[in-house]
């Protein structure tokens, strides 16, 4: 056993010369395989004269407090081992061995010295207060809570340098929401640009920095959103800068006062207005622009598709046929119910129209010349025919004039028959169309050729051609 212990000196005189100071006890080489029992204690007593150590005063509380602990101590000086010391020298060594002291840093540890002392009562009295002071510092588990606390505190301190505090965080509102809140809280419901800036900075500390960036965004939001209206200063309010207010129709952008997300975009409603601030009269701007060509139409300046979209309601007033296959029967029906304007259109148009065969398949392939279409279109526009809404290019309501609304049911039945019949098929005689037969009318009137012309222009056929 003694061969495993390597000390600087083998004699007691050498040992005392190395450690002349009685208040210093340095640990040397770890002692392994410390057996429990008094046999090891006797061997250690023979190896080191304990009389000199006890008489030198190492067992006093002062000596314990001044002694240096080796960092290599493991769980040997745990509170359980220290608590086993007052039971006697043999019990103390047994408890230390049971605690797993395989890597004790010193043979002359405080527990070993306390158990090896010649006066057990005095050594235990001195070890009592020392054990209380040793518990928090020598136990390995004592460092865990304090280290965790320090790491947690250090991490929190580092996080504060990288993260803003809660009041200085970026608010979850868009610029449109901020402007709307600022304008709505004003007593006059209007603010200048500088007043909007100031209100945002007063309420949200986040916007007190990088002012140039977000102020540019505020200006862009005011300019490019139709819900904000610019109001000029009145003479009784002199100053610099115009006022900004909310559009009267934009009150429902935010639902229940929640400014986190807009319920609907007011820009879509305001976009048709081509004029300035108010959007009340601007909602009708697009239909009026589409119906703008009220004078004579130049056939060279407009494409056939453009003429077909803009003038179909007025051109087809005298011939309310929904499809190209309705040529002979529709002519008889329209001839019986045509108005005065329709009869006036037949005289110049019939003189310039080419003669076409009476068969239903012959006139479909015949192209329509623009020279005939131009005077027809111009006379219709000069007549001042009413304009209709363009829901569908060949809607029955759009192709019908106001004087022919009483025949609406007849045309509905006729339209249903055309959707399920081929071009050359004969129509049922039960339809209330009336008039002469197909063979009695050889020339086809030009007003009935309009659906045939537009059928080739539109990419999507209206009738079923299978």
From Swiss-Prot:
Give the top-rank taxon of the lineage listed in the UniProt record for this protein.
Eukaryota
- The signal peptide stretch is none
Biased composition range(s): Gly residues: 273-284
Composition bias type Low complexity, residue spans: 318-328, 344-358
Main localization category: nucleus
Region of interest: Essential for DNA binding: 251-288
Q: Which residues carry this modification: Phosphoserine?
A: 303, 327
What does the UniProt keyword field contain? Activator, Chromatin regulator, Developmental protein, DNA-binding, Nucleus, Phosphoprotein, Repressor, Transcription, Transcription regulation
What is the disulfide pattern of this chain? none
MF terms from GO for this chain are: chromatin binding; DNA binding; DNA-binding transcription activator activity, RNA polymerase II-specific; DNA-binding transcription factor activity; DNA-binding transcription factor activity, RNA polymerase II-specific; double-stranded DNA binding; protein domain specific binding; RNA polymerase II cis-regulatory region sequence-specific DNA binding
Gene3D superfamilies given in the database record? Winged helix-like DNA-binding domain superfamily/Winged helix DNA-binding domain
One GO biological-process annotation of the entry reads: hormone metabolic process
Which sequence positions fall in the DNA-binding region? 169-260
Do the record's keywords include Transit peptide? no
Which residue stretches belong to region Disordered? 269-358
One GO cellular component term noted in the UniProt record for this chain: microvillus
Tissue expression remark: Liver.
List where in the cell it is found: Nucleus
Q: Does the keyword Cell division apply?
A: no
Q: What does this protein do?
A: Transcription factor that is involved in embryonic development, establishment of tissue-specific gene expression and regulation of gene expression in differentiated tissues. Is thought to act as a 'pioneer' factor opening the compacted chromatin for other proteins through interactions with nucleosomal core histones and thereby replacing linker histones at target enhancer and/or promoter sites. Binds DNA with the consensus sequence 5'-[AC]A[AT]T[AG]TT[GT][AG][CT]T[CT]-3'.
PANTHER family for the chain: FORKHEAD BOX PROTEIN, HEPATOCYTE NUCLEAR FACTOR 3-ALPHA
Subunit organization: Binds DNA as a monomer. Interacts with FOXA2. Interacts with NKX2-1. Interacts with HDAC7. Interacts with the histone H3-H4 heterodimer. Associates with nucleosomes containing histone H2A. Interacts with AR. Interacts with NR0B2.
Q: What is this protein called?
A: Hepatocyte nuclear factor 3-alpha
Instruction: Write down the species.
Output: Rattus norvegicus (Rat)
